[in-house]
């Protein structure tokens, strides 16, 4: 509850109100909006996975700087190798959280479902995902990996980054911790766009939901 109140208060202080978009209202995609306002953006890709968003941003912008964060060491190694000749792409083997420290990453059969949160048992989501990979729900988590964590406030201070044009977050229910760790940047209006990918299904223990902000 404290996290929910903090986030609502934080966005109110900045003059924003969070609510659902009416289904009848046409909305532009991020990819349509970004080029209208940004030319040489600094982008943070939190939850880089296999580099899907990196490739997407490469198609939108000619000149850019991307700092991507991927706690899964195996995926990090692949990203590091894939973009080793791109001087404007910085790959970090870190989990973004509310503070510097350590945590445990639950690595699942489907890499995109891996999370810093525990997976809820006996849910429809888990049964469906397990079936897709021909495994038992109890074995959907392949292994647990100890990871280093960082807050974006600290990362920006360490790397002398004054502004972030796009903050993309896809952390499987861990988004609130990322936002709390970005609070100074947000309060100083140093982040222009925040792109959140939020899971709405019951999947993780204490996962962040858009509905939390509406309550």
Protein language model annotation of sequence segments:
Residues 1-215:
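Phosphate/nucleotide-binding beta-alpha loop and adjacent structural elements of enzyme active sites
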């Amino acid at each position: 509850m404290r996290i929910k109140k903090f986030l609502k208060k934080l966005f109110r202080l900045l003059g924003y109100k969070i609510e659902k978009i009416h289904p009848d209202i046409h909305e532009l995609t991020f990819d349509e909006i970004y080029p209208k306002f940004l030319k040489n953006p600094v982008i943070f890709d939190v939850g880089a996975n296999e580099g899907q968003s990196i490739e997407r941003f490469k198609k939108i912008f000619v000149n850019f700087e991307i700092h991507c964060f991927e706690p899964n060491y195996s995926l990090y190694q692949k990203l590091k190798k894939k973009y080793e000749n791109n001087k404007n792409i910085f790959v970090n083997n870190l989990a973004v959280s509310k503070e510097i420290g350590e945590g445990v990453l639950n690595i699942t059969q489907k890499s995109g479902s891996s999370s810093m949160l525990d997976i809820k048992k006996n849910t429809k989501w888990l049964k469906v995902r397990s079936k897709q990979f021909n495994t038992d729900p109890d074995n959907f988590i392949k292994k647990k990996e100890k990871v280093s964590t960082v807050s974006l406030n600290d990362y920006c201070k360490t790397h002398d980054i004054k502004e972030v044009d796009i903050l993309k977050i896809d952390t499987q229910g861990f988004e609130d911790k990322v936002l709390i760790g970005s609070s100074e940047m947000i309060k100083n209006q140093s982040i222009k766009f925040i792109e959140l990918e939020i899971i709405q299904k019951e999947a993780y223990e204490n996962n962040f939901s858009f509905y939390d902000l509406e309550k």
